[in-house]
Amino acid sequence: MQEFLATSERRAELYWWFATLFSAELSDKQIAEYDSYDVRSFLKSLSTLDPMRPAVTELNEAIARLLVRDERATALAADFKGLFLADTAVQPYESAHLDASSLGRMQQRLVRLAIDVSAKYPQPVDHLGVELDLMGNLIIRAAEAPSADQREQWLGEQEAVLHGHLLAWFPHFEVACRAADPFGFYGASARLLGVFLTMDANYLSLVKPASSAD
């Protein structure tokens, strides 16, 4: 159980990190943190996982370019706006890659779960950041569940969001983002997120049956 709790905390942190990354422009202070010991250690720990290693290497290379980029915060903000906010943007919304019903399904899910994201995310609720943030919250609910049955329920909710939403459309977003990002920071981040989502789906398929025993 302790291993489950530790893994849950790490998974939630990853989802929230990616949610922040794709939801708003990074400030210069946030960019500077990518040169900190904590972030370097964090990425190094991810690179110990074989499926993640090439994606982490690509992101580290993009970070190295970003840290020495002229007016880096302004330049990265321009990348963000051009990629995700312009008329020809790579839309970070599920409904833009599947169909309009995706937005309604996510709205219904949040209502059923009694989760309100409006204060944190002004975007429509099928935005990538919202779906990633939701996964982080569901992970913590599973970790804090007082019984095996409730833990099983929250693990099932995680699988539903992953397979019913994120994995259904994110691969399309990832391809488009990588093709449209010449500097490469967001493209590399999307690649790493894609690997993580696949690995997390595999993790859930393994941990869900085993979690039924306290």
Curated annotation (Swiss-Prot):
Subcellular locations according to the entry: Cytoplasm
Domain of life, source organism: Bacteria
Disulfide bonds: none
InterPro entries according to UniProt: Chaperone_TorD, DMSO/NO3_reduct_chaperone, HscB_C_sf, TorD-like_sf, TorD/DmsD_chaperones
Residues in the signal sequence: none
Gene Ontology cellular-component terms listed: cytoplasm
Pfam families reported for this sequence: Nitrate_red_del
Keywords: Chaperone, Cytoplasm
Classification via SUPFAM superfamilies: TorD-like (SSF89155)
One of the GO BP terms on file: protein complex oligomerization
HAMAP family: TorD
Similarity comment: Belongs to the TorD/DmsD family. TorD subfamily.
Role this protein plays: Involved in the biogenesis of TorA. Acts on TorA before the insertion of the molybdenum cofactor and, as a result, probably favors a conformation of the apoenzyme that is competent for acquiring the cofactor.
Name recorded for this polypeptide: Chaperone protein TorD
Upper lineage: Bacteria, Pseudomonadati, Pseudomonadota, Gammaproteobacteria, Aeromonadales
